[in-house]
């Protein structure tokens, strides 16, 4: 069973585009949540992830970081392990 992936983004963020491109390339289903105009969601995101930047990526509710962290997990093979519990 594949894990649930959520990607918190803004509309103009190049790192968000990069992270989503990797997920699409790997055929990993994900839910995109645009926080660009929602202060409440942004506030929650900072509390949940400890970060003020986007994208922030969560796998089964656990923050894994942003685009760089996602790419590092993919390169090391760890992303596949996180996705298939």
Roles of regions detected by a PLM:
Residues 1-9, 59, 78-84:
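Long, low-complexity, intrinsically disordered polar/charged segments
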Residues 10, 51, 76:
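ATP/adenylate-binding site constellation spanning eukaryotic-like Ser/Thr protein kinases
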Residues 22, 26-27, 47, 72, ...:
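Non-catalytic interaction surface on structured domains
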Residues 49-58, 68:
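Structural micro-motif
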Residues 35-52, 82-85:
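Thioredoxin-like thiol-disulfide oxidoreductase module
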Residues 1-29:
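Local sequence-structure signature of Cys/Sec-based thiol-disulfide redox active-site neighborhoods
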Residues 62-85:
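Non-catalytic, surface beta->alpha helical segment in thiol-disulfide oxidoreductase systems
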